[in-house]
């Protein structure tokens, strides 16, 4: 059973949008972009939508996606389309960043703190990275460069993703499924 729990940030009211949805599209990407859920609803609903309000998507009681409302499109044919993105979207903004004697866990934590993002487990090797001086660069690119340098120094490949509302940094061996299927997977 699919559940799409939406909570309005201003009123605190909560709805299960699965009961009034016509179509649900879950989009994932391997790197460089945020995951998203796009929901098409019948306009007969009395739900008030506020940007930044959270959505929890569960399938058979398993946590699939947690994101925030970023787009509302009202259509003439009595439908509304909502788009929610996970926290990775906020890392696509350009920032200036300076760090010295830090490891990738500390860099992710510092950047997430600057954006007021929630952090989960950060399980990267604690190798000290070269000094970081970045100007007007995407926060996600800064993190990716730190992950790349950690790979070179430690030999450990790292994965950064939003695990149901918490930025998580780990190695593929710590993931529940250790296969990647897609255009770049060579499968």
Where are these regions (language model features)?
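Short intrinsically disordered coil segments
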Residues: 55-56, 97-102, 182-187
């Amino acid at each position: 059973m699919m559940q799409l729990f939406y909570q309005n940030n201003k009123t605190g009211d909560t709805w299960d949008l699965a009961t009034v949805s016509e179509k649900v599209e879950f989009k994932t990407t391997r790197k460089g972009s945020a995951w998203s859920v796009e929901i098409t609803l019948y306009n007969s609903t009395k739900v008030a939508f506020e940007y930044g309000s959270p959505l929890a998507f569960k399938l058979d009681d398993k946590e699939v996606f947690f994101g925030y409302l970023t787009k509302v499109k009202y259509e003439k044919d009595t439908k509304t389309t909502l788009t929610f993105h996970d926290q990775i979207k906020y890392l696509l903004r350009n920032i200036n960043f300076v760090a010295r004697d830090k490891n990738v866990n500390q860099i992710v934590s510092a950047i997430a703190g600057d954006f007021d993002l929630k952090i989960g487990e950060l399980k990267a090797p604690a190798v000290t990275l070269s000094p970081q001086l970045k100007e007007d660069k995407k926060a996600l690119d800064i993190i990716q460069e730190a992950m790349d340098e950690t790979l070179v120094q430690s030999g450990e490949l790292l994965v950064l993703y939003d695990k149901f509302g918490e930025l998580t940094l780990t190695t593929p061996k710590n993931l529940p499924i250790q296969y990647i299927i897609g255009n770049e997977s060579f499968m």
